[in-house]
């Protein structure tokens, strides 16, 4: 099982630690990935497209998903679409059904950002897949886990500097994967 979380950038910016060479190397991991989990910045880098911003329509989602599937990913979870309606959307598509079979997963957006949510999402998704959940269900479980972890985190001192405190919600993740 090869799950690829690119961790290359966010908000339209490449992380300072990433070089063009590392971006190209990450692109080689797309081909054959059982599940590729980029945010919109990472998807833009991997497909060689301009960053479209967080508010993209269904046609743009289909274009990006199609390009990532065409690059060889077996399944794609495109994360973090924010259309300004209080929801964060993730989209799941597979090479077997193409973009026509994509699934939209929406979670309530919280009024703050914290670091580490992408890592927590990828880890929770991996755990749910390993527990036998189909990818779309695993992505939904991961999204709910991250949202609940962020809700717990907001009550911790200096939470914006510390990052997501997911440990308080691990019991919930275990319960979600057993349902």
Residue ranges of predicted features:
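Short beta-strand/loop segments at the ligand-binding rim of alpha/beta enzyme cores
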Residues: 1-2
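Rossmann-like NAD(P)(H) cofactor-binding subdomain of soluble oxidoreductases
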Residues: 6, 10-18
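Glycine-rich beta-alpha junction loops
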Residues: 8-10, 42, 80-83, 108-111, ...
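Conserved phosphate/ATP/ADP-binding segment of small-molecule kinases
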Residues: 16-101
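Short, small-residue alpha-helix embedded
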Residues: 45, 112-135
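Phosphate-handling active-site elements
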Residues: 99-104, 128-142
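Short pre-catalytic strand/loop immediately N-terminal to key active-site residues, enriched for Gly-Thr
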Residues: 101-116
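Charged C-terminal helix
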Residues: 136-179
């Amino acid at each position: 099982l090869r799950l690829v979380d690119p961790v290359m950038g966010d908000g339209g910016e490449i992380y300072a630690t990433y070089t063009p060479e590392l971006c190209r190397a990450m692109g080689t991991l797309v081909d054959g990935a059982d599940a590729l989990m980029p945010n919109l910045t990472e998807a833009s880098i991997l497909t060689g497209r301009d960053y479209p911003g967080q508010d993209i329509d269904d046609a743009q989602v289909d274009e990006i998903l199609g390009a990532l599937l065409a690059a060889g990913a077996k399944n794609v979870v495109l994360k973090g679409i924010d259309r300004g309606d209080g929801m964060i959307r993730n989209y799941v598509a597979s090479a077997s059904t193409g973009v026509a079979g994509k699934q939209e997963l929406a979670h309530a957006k919280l009024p703050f950002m914290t670091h580490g949510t992408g890592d927590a999402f990828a880890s929770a998704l991996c755990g749910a897949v390993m527990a036998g959940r189909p990818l779309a269900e695993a992505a939904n479980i991961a999204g709910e886990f991250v949202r609940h972890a962020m809700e717990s985190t907001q009550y911790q001192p200096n939470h914006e500097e510390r990052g997501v405190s997911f440990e308080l919600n691990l019991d919930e993740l275990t319960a979600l994967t057993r349902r």
